[in-house]
Curated annotation (Swiss-Prot):
<keyword id="KW-0368">Histidine biosynthesis</keyword>
<dbReference type="InterPro" id="IPR004651">
    <property type="entry name" value="HisF"/>
</dbReference>
<dbReference type="InterPro" id="IPR050064">
    <property type="entry name" value="IGPS_HisA/HisF"/>
</dbReference>
<protein>
    <recommendedName>
        <fullName>Imidazole glycerol phosphate synthase subunit HisF</fullName>
        <ecNumber>4.3.2.10</ecNumber>
    </recommendedName>
</protein>
<comment type="function">
    <text>IGPS catalyzes the conversion of PRFAR and glutamine to IGP, AICAR and glutamate. The HisF subunit catalyzes the cyclization activity that produces IGP and AICAR from PRFAR using the ammonia provided by the HisH subunit.</text>
</comment>
<comment type="pathway">
    <text>Amino-acid biosynthesis; L-histidine biosynthesis; L-histidine from 5-phospho-alpha-D-ribose 1-diphosphate: step 5/9.</text>
</comment>
<comment type="similarity">
    <text>Belongs to the HisA/HisF family.</text>
</comment>
<dbReference type="InterPro" id="IPR013785">
    <property type="entry name" value="Aldolase_TIM"/>
</dbReference>
<comment type="subunit">
    <text>Heterodimer of HisH and HisF.</text>
</comment>
<feature type="active site">
    <location>
        <position position="11"/>
    </location>
</feature>
<keyword id="KW-0028">Amino-acid biosynthesis</keyword>
<keyword id="KW-0963">Cytoplasm</keyword>
<dbReference type="GO" id="GO:0005737">
    <property type="term" value="C:cytoplasm"/>
</dbReference>
<dbReference type="GO" id="GO:0000105">
    <property type="term" value="P:L-histidine biosynthetic process"/>
</dbReference>
<dbReference type="InterPro" id="IPR006062">
    <property type="entry name" value="His_biosynth"/>
</dbReference>
<dbReference type="Pfam" id="PF00977">
    <property type="entry name" value="His_biosynth"/>
</dbReference>
<keyword id="KW-0456">Lyase</keyword>
Length: 257
């Protein structure tokens, strides 16, 4: 059985790590490189970096820090933010990232998923999906430009349909960002994860809502996700990654120690 992954997520804005609640009101957490190094040393399996305003600003991830991160960590990392072409992706991979993740650009141009998968292989193409539960309609809707409060908007896609579409086009992994839970620390949306898991045949990463160690265990045991991503609980040292892995092991969950 493949080990379940623990993935700290670092939202980057203007060269610093920031964190919001439900994608709003971001506060500065600190510098990118020391934080990345700390997580690698604590036992993270992988890191994900989101340049959260790159897509809405119409630019690509600022590359200077990607190379600096690659120099100090020896675990895989994924970079997202405004990647609109194979050239953009190639540059980030050349700087040392192991994977690239696309979100809003994939919604604008779904063919991009196929182009990147064909050129670099599906194993390094991740699609991020920002999913919002609309209480009025009872539906999970895909949103885009979520890094910019003024431009965030619903798309025509329902989450389940978009999950199927991106797989058809070559996504090698899916990160499901559950917007209602983001930064609230009340647990992952297990119901939504199960709905997506039914149609998701590639690795599925849960994102949004982790507040306690048992939330990670729930996501693995009740929704069979391949990895769980979290930010605020790690940034604010509410949960130590090494201790989390020991806890998960005690729950009978396969993790890399």
């Amino acid at each position: 059985m493949l080990a379940k992954r623990i993935i700290p997520c670092l939202d980057v804005r203007d060269g610093q790590v920031v964190k919001g609640v439900q994608f709003r009101n971001h506060e500065i957490i600190g510098d990118i490189v020391p934080l990345a190094k700390r997580y690698a040393e604590e036992g993270a399996d992988e890191l994900v970096f989101y340049d959260i305003t790159a897509s809405s600003d119409g630019r690509v991830v600022d590359k200077s820090w990607v190379a600096r991160v690659a120099e100090v960590i020896d675990i895989p990392f994924c970079v997202a933010g405004g990647i609109k072409s194979a050239e953009d992706a190639a540059r980030i991979l050349e700087f040392g990232a192991d994977k690239v993740s696309i979100n809003s650009p994939a919604l604008a141009n779904p063919q991009l998923i196929t182009d990147l998968a064909d050129k670099f292989g599906v194993q390094c193409i991740v699609v991020g999906i920002d999913s919002y539960y609309d209480k009025d309609t009872g539906k999970y809707q895909v949103y885009q430009f979520t890094g910019d409060e003024e431009r965030t908007k619903a798309t025509k896609w329902e989450t389940r349909d978009w999950v199927q579409e991106v797989q058809k086009r070559g996504a090698g992994e899916i990160v499901l960002n559950m917007m209602n839970q983001d930064g609230v620390r009340s647990g992952y949306d297990i119901e939504q994860l199960n709905m997506v898991r039914e149609v998701c045949k590639v690795p599925l990463i849960a994102s949004g809502g982790a507040g306690a160690m048992e939330h990670f265990a729930e996501a693995y045991q009740k929704a069979n996700v391949d990895g769980a991503l979290a930010a605020s609980v790690f940034h604010k040292q509410v949960i130590n990654i090494g201790e989390l892995k020991q806890y998960l092991k005690q729950q009978g969950i396969e993790v890399r120690l």
